[in-house]
Structure formats: structure tokens, C-alpha cells
Amino acid sequence: MSDSMSYAVLVAATLFLGIGLQIAWLFFSNFIKRKRLESRISEVSIAIGKNAKNPENEAYVLNYLKEKFSPERFENRITDALGLIISVIHIPLSLLITVWYFAMIAGRIFGFMNIEPVVLWVPMILQLLLSIAIFIFSVFIKIVFGRYPGEANGFNKEFIKTIK
């Protein structure tokens, strides 16, 4: 197999694996969101002493959540700030990793960046490590503060939309 053919195969493999990893992470994220929602419903039911899924208890649920996610609470301000920091770091880093990956492919094709083909796996690994690090950090914040980064802000935005 020629050098350019093996490079093309490696590019295709990293692209398919990268897309596969993103799809798998999306499914994992949706699974985690469902688990968080179930956990939140259980928490609210215990806190108000009534079934949170029952529409008759909507006012109790809403009052509990408004109090829990109130912008005046210190832990909400901290976790919202941490959520913003995560976004400010994650989005540019993900974009840089993606640009770097495609720049390596273009550099090899057009001859201005002579890299070993195996180096194409590095951006994929970095992207996966970044996602895992953010997930672990978010779980740590949940353990310390009782809510995920940006969760209070997200609730308050949705609550304001519902009122309007």
C-alpha cells in the first residue's frame, strides 16, 4: 500500500472514529440528562413530601425549584460562574482541536506540514479527554454544591420563558 493510500485510510478511520465518538457521547449525554431528570424528580418529591409528577402538585414543585435555584443563593452564583467558565474554555478548545485536526490533514495533502499519519489520532484523543475532564469536573461540582455547573441559570432561563 502506498504512503498516500495508507494516509487516506488513516484519515478516513480517524474521521469515522471521531464521528462515532461524537455520536456515542451524544447518546451518553442524553442518557445522563434523563438520569438527572429522574433524580431531580425524586429529590423534589422527597423535599415537598408529595409526588412531583402529579400535576396537582405543580405549585409546590415550582416553589421548591424557584427557591433551590434562586439567583440570590451563593452556591447558585458559584455554579453558574463555573458553568460559564466551562463554556468559555470548552468551546474554543474544541474548535481549536478540530481546526488543528483538519489543518494536519490539509498540511499533509498540500505538503506544508509533514507529519506522521499516526499523529492524526492525537486530536481525537484530546477531544475525548477534554469531554471526560468536563464530565468529571461537573460531577465533582454536583457533589460539592448539590447542582451541576450552570444548572441554576438554565432553570431560571426556562422559568422566565414559561412565564412569558
Swiss-Prot record:
Gene designation per UniProt: sieA
Compartment annotation: Host cell inner membrane
Membrane topology (UniProt): Multi-pass membrane protein
GO CC annotation: host cell membrane; host cell plasma membrane; membrane
Signal peptide: none
Protein name, per record: Superinfection exclusion protein A
Membrane-spanning intervals of the chain: 8-28, 85-105, 121-141
Keyword annotations: Host cell inner membrane, Host cell membrane, Host membrane, Membrane, Transmembrane, Transmembrane helix
Main location: host cell
Highest taxon listed in the record's lineage: Viruses
Function in brief: Probably blocks the subsequent transfer of the phage DNA across the inner membrane into the cytoplasm. By this means, P22 excludes superinfection by the phages of the same family and also against DNA coming from oter phages.
Stretches assigned to coiled coil: none
